[in-house]
Amino acid sequence: MGNRPDELKALLDSVARQDGAPIEVVVVGQGVRLPGLADPAAGVRTVELPENLGIPGGRNVGIEAFRTPGGHGFDADVLLFLDDDGLLERTDTAELCRQAFTEDPELGIVSFRIADPQTGETQRRHVPRLRASDPMRSSRVTTFLGGANAVRTKVFEQVGDLPGQFFYAHEETDLAWRALDAGWLIDYRADMVLLHPATAPSRHAVYHRMVARNRVWLARRNLPALLVPVYVGVWLLLTLLRKPSGPALKAWFGGFKEGWTTSCGPRRPMKWRTVWRLTRLGRPPVI
């Protein structure tokens, strides 16, 4: 979490109101203190980090908190990841999650729908597929929303955690591609809703740099060699077509260069049958 204590309390209250078995909660403070928040009787634990490790780094700390002693396996079958300024709209969301994972043993990740609490609208960028005009349509997808999702812990056991070095942007797609390559499925569920104020992504220089750098890292880490220049080239063209400002474009190209000249972490190119699978799901890994 960051520095939104009122919103966090509302979120925790909405989690506590969920039907079915109680949900154990871990709140990760990224460079902030969490005084008085831990409540063992209510199943709430806290982890205070001395610095901000970024979105994937902080979530990896939360994942680690659910590992069994010795790091072999987990104390839970499914982990929920919720933004600290969100709110679960319904009381049956956790039960819907349990039902989804129980009924489909190949389901690895569920992406919730994010809706504005005032208007009820879902922003197009919060629908994790190319055909995003109807956010009320649930479907099988190729990625997921980082601030509102559920992941089967066996996915982490098999393919590893989120890429902490990404810090911000595209870490979900990195995990999604690895999960899909391992045979897991990802669903977008319009009936599982996290209320979250509609916002625009930050458009500062750091944002543009990380988006560009992580696009390159994503391709270098996960795509067959033949597709790496195609994927990166398509996103270069799309960026230019959007006509960003001069400072934004300068930051973007700085990140683009950084993506090629710095370590992206381990390279594990997906199988060609996974490329075809992504294509059949409506999002070939070139866009």
Predicted regions and their residues:
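Short, acidic, metal-binding catalytic loop of nucleotide-sugar glycosyltransferases
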Residues: 13-22
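Short beta-strand-to-loop acidic/aromatic patch adjacent to the donor-nucleotide binding site
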Residues: 71-87
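Conserved donor NDP-sugar-binding/catalytic core segment of glycosyltransferases
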Residues: 87, 91-123
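Active-site donor/metal-binding and catalytic loop motifs
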Residues: 182-206, 215-218
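Non-catalytic, C-terminal membrane-associated alpha-helical segments of glycosyltransferases
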Residues: 210, 225-287
